[in-house]
Amino acid sequence: MLGDTTLKQLKDEISTLEYERYIKQLRYDEEASRTDLAVYIAPNQFIANWVKTKYGERLAHLFELSTGIRPKIEIRLGSLKKDVKSSSPKAGVSKGQKSTILNPSFTFDSFVVGNSNRFAYEVSQNVAKKQGIAYNPLLIYGGTGLGKTHLLNSIGNYNVAKGKSVIYVTSEQFLNDYLYHIRNNTMDRFRDKYRACDYLLIDDVQFFGGKPQIQEEFFHTFNELHNKNKQIVLTSDKTPKQIAGLEERLKSRFEWGMVSDIQPPELETKINIIKKKCEFDGIYLSNEIISYIATNMDNNIREIEGIIIKLNAYANLMNQEITLQFAKNVLKEQIKEERENITLENIIEVVSKELNVKPAEIKSKGRSKNIANARRIVIFLARTLTPNSMPSLAQFFGMKDHSSVSKAMKTVKTEIEEDANFKMVIEELKNKIKSRN
């Protein structure tokens, strides 16, 4: 296969160490690839990111040298075993038409459930077990990296194991597939593929916004599947009503079944996610390190998991044990970037909303209990989440000197140590602030 030949060509251009560690871990996905798209499967996000960033352009060039066409290079996550398919062959869905591969590690068992995602998890399980009966369609919405794709794959993997026909694609892949069949005058094959499955799973459906041609095609696909009691599951970064450029008839249909959100994970859930990831990958991190990562990184689960892989990779490359100091050194730039992205105004906005105190009151010299408490919390969070110094905060709040800031910090720290509920409030405020950036 050309994809494998291209990897062998790349082998001659790079070091043996790089080839063994990264390129050798890839598998060319012939079924998902086309003349304008070359798809490789990687075992984890770290390798996928590394190959895409460092070798993506070179791989595209090597393809171009052989075929005269420069394809888009996609690195997807999945099993390296060649017999893993995204759906079971059934009449009308031929084996050669599978558009992508489900991530075998994304199952209901590997999904970490917390207050932030419990409802979406329960609804997804219900839909997986009751095709076209429980909620059809199911649309899960929420920010990037919160677990929407994990649940989508979980539904797919559960039903593949049951012998069901499953198609899982991103909305961009659906569009590219549509354009490919339009160009080749094979729309009958496209419709056979997407309208003859038991489960149609589409990720990031907000991508359809502003694209009337693909919306028209999907409208008819949706209707045919729904009329046959076939299950449709969609994800989006916003509610149907918030998707700009989406036709009203599709917005209406997306709300026919169930619309469920996923919120940023609370601290306890983040800790459990890290522990689960470490257990799955056979990586040991102390509770101290796990707590450090959960507290200092944002709420994007995908990024948190990538950090764990990065830590482990650095430790292996440098032949070092992962200690707290080692973790701090490896992650310091990412944490610095996190802190620089959060502003004092962001913090004031969130705290004022959650504690029901006006932003102007927090910035004032008002001394009522509620206002003073909110101001102390803002100061504590600003020192924790941003690069603001104590003198700069004292100046912002019109205090005499930074000793007043130090006193506010000490008061909040003491209350955190003595009151578990207050500590939880602070952690939730941190999460809400980080999720806005």
From Swiss-Prot:
GO terms for molecular function: ATP binding; ATP hydrolysis activity; DNA replication origin binding; lipid binding. Keywords: ATP-binding, Cytoplasm, DNA replication, DNA-binding, Lipid-binding, Nucleotide-binding. CDD domains: AAA (cd00009), Bac_DnaA_C (cd06571). Coiled coil: none annotated. Residues 69-100 are annotated as: Domain II. ATP binds at G145, G147, K148, T149. Residues 101-315 are annotated as: Domain III, AAA+ region. It holds the Pfam family Bac_DnaA. GO terms for cellular component: cytoplasm; plasma membrane. Belongs to the DnaA family. Oligomerizes as a right-handed, spiral filament on DNA at oriC. Plays an essential role in the initiation and regulation of chromosomal replication. ATP-DnaA binds to the origin of replication (oriC) to initiate formation of the DNA replication initiation complex once per cell cycle. Binds the DnaA box (a 9 base pair repeat at the origin) and separates the double-stranded (ds)DNA. Forms a right-handed helical filament on oriC DNA; dsDNA binds to the exterior of the filament while single-stranded (ss)DNA is stabiized in the filament's interior. Domain I is involved in oligomerization and binding regulators, domain II is flexibile and of varying length in different bacteria, domain III forms the AAA+ region, while domain IV binds dsDNA. This is Chromosomal replication initiator protein DnaA. It comes from Wolinella succinogenes (strain ATCC 29543 / DSM 1740 / CCUG 13145 / JCM 31913 / LMG 7466 / NCTC 11488 / FDC 602W) (Vibrio succinogenes). The lineage of its organism: Bacteria, Pseudomonadati, Campylobacterota, Epsilonproteobacteria, Campylobacterales. The gene is dnaA.
